[in-house]
Each structure stands twice: as C-alpha cells, then as structure tokens.
C-alpha cells in the first residue's frame, strides 16, 4: 500500500523540506531543511524537495499560512484521530486516520472506516503510532538509502507535557526510525540534526539549539557562540547573522528557527 492523497489536492504542489544527511551539500532551495557535514538546510518559504508524509496531531490546529499550506496540499496526510474533527472543519480529507479511537465519535468511525486504522497499544502516543503506520507503508529507496521526510503539524499547544514529549520525539524518529522529521508550528520549525551541519537562514532569524548528545558543539554565523550545553535553556534565543549558519558537533541536537513571515 502506498499512501497518497494527491487526488484531494487542488493545487498539486506542497511545501517542502530539503534532505538532511551527513557529508552532503545540497543546492539552495526555497524550502525548509538542513545541510549536514556539510548538509544543507534552506529557509521555509518556497518549493523544494518533497515530504513523504504530513502528520497532523491533536494539539493546536495550525493558523499560520505556511503550515496551513502544507496541510491543504499534502499528498500523504495521516491524521491522529483526535485531530480529525478539526481537519474536517477546513474541508480537508485525510489519507488515513490513526489512533486508539477514544477521540472519535461512532459516526466518524463509520464514515472513515475505510481509512481508519485503530492501534490500541499504549506504549506509544498517537503521534508515534501515526509515524510508524506511515513509515511501514512507504516504499524506501534502498539503493540511495534516502531518508523519508516527515512533516508534523498540530504537535504543540494544549497540554505542555504533550508538547515537550512531541518535540523530543523528533530525535527519536531521526535516530531510531531513520526519517528526517520536521515539526512546523505557527511560529517556526524544529529539525533534528547530527554532526556538522550548515543551515540556511536569513539575517535576524531567531535560532535555538537543544543539545542531546554532543560533547563538542560550536557554531559559525550566529550572534552568540555556542558550546556543549548541559541544560536545554542554554542554547535558546540565538540569532542568525546572514543567510546561513553552521553547527559543528559530534552528536545529535535539535534546531529551532522562526518563520520569516
């Protein structure tokens, strides 16, 4: 089964994020992504590489034009069951609905029975259940070992513990599931990264770095020098000086960047 929601797209295009792989330099794109070792990461704003899947969680529904554009034009849209009602208010149809079903009315379960995939186990939250479902239904490029690119929307807001958990899952998906995850909010976007990576940016863009496993951590192109942070707050509230910056690292970390518009 290949999940595909293209028939529901009126525009046929969607926002993209470039690939993030070690020792790679990608050409500049007006999308969203990274460059690592050196890998490349353009700013969010145009059309670049494609998303394998867009996953909508049941946090605050997007209101910013960029995540809404991604949502409306996604080819493969997997929705956590708790977000289905909000999605339908925007007249957007999902490719699949995933979850334990406790957030769905019987009417919606029957209406979407053909694409509803109940998963009752309790070890993972609905965001991870949706990710595992999408991951298992994608054809992978074994010859190039290309990571699929997943975009996460509606994954912040409402309960703060869910927000913190969902952000931390970006590294779990990156390391354990071999995908390139990007969490897009109304204010900016989070990406998981590893090793030395060059990130496209813009002057004045607000940047935060959250260290996970780095014992060596430095930067070029940011207003304030960084170091191997031992606390999450220590890498917040930095600023890009130009159209790109580079993180030199020997481990994993999460980067947050604000939208330009």
Give each language-model segment a name.
Residues 13-16:
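N-terminal, intrinsically disordered charge-dense segments
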Residues 30-33, 45-47:
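Glycine-biased, low-complexity coil/linker segments
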Residues 51-111:
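N-terminal beta-strand-loop-alpha-helix module at the start
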Residues 63-65, 125-128, 159-164:
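Short glycine/serine/threonine-rich phosphate/pyrophosphate-binding segments
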Residues 113-142:
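Short phosphate-binding loop-to-helix
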Residues 149-195:
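Anionic-ligand-binding alpha/beta catalytic cores of soluble enzymes and soluble regulatory domains
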Residues 193-261:
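Long, charged alpha-helical interface segments
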């Amino acid at each position: 089964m290949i999940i595909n929601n293209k028939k529901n797209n009126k525009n046929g295009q969607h926002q993209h994020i470039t690939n993030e792989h070690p020792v790679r330099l990608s050409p500049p794109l007006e999308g969203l992504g990274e460059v690592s070792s050196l890998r490349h990461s353009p700013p969010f704003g145009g059309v670049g590489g494609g998303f394998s899947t867009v996953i909508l969680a049941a946090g605050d529904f997007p209101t910013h034009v960029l995540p809404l554009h991604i949502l409306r034009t996604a080819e493969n849209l997997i929705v956590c069951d708790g977000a289905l009602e909000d999605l339908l208010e925007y007249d957007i149809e999902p490719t699949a609905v995933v979850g334990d079903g406790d957030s769905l009315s019987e009417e919606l379960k029957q209406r979407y029975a053909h694409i509803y995939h109940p998963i009752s186990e309790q070890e993972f939250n609905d965001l991870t259940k949706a990710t595992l479902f999408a991951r298992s239904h994608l054809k992978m490029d074994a010859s190039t070992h290309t990571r699929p690119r997943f975009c996460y929307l509606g994954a912040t807001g409402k309960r703060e513990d869910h927000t913190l958990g969902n952000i931390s899952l970006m590294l779990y998906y990156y390391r354990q599931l071999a995908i390139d995850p990007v969490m897009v909010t109304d204010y900016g976007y989070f990406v998981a990264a590893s090793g030395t990576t060059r990130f496209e940016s813009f002057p004045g863009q607000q940047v935060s770095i959250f260290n996970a496993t780095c014992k060596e951590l430095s930067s070029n192109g940011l207003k304030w020098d960084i170091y191997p942070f031992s606390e999450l707050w220590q890498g917040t509230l930095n600023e890009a000086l130009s159209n790109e910056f580079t993180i030199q690292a020997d481990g994993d970390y999460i980067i947050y960047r604000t939208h330009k518009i």
